[in-house]
Amino acid sequence: MITAKFYQKPSQGSIHMTLKGHANAAPKGEDLVCASATMLAYTVAQAVQFLDEQGMLKKKPKISLKEGSATIIATPTEEGYAMVLHTFWVAQCGIHVLQHNYPQNVQLEHLKV
């Protein structure tokens, strides 16, 4: 099962996304549920890098993308907060759809906004 978590650490001003595990909906290389979750993680990672290049982050984002694991942490500036939060929220919406359609393969812990 893929476990997805989206959360904030107000004391650090950071927004987090983590994915762990495998969907196991099909054999490796054929699992569309896993591929969908992976694509969402890669999209957030790229968007966060673009936001950093545009000066919307206080510091470089932390991005770790490995087989069965993804962690993305962004610390937005005051001006960039809404854009960064929206980026993570859109990915959370995608994971929500996956969880709704494949509840046996995906579990989501929602970002509180």
List each model region and its residues.
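Short, conserved glycine- and acidic-residue-centered signature motifs
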Residues: 33-37
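N-terminal intrinsically disordered, cationic/polar leader segments
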Residues: 1-32, 42, 46-113
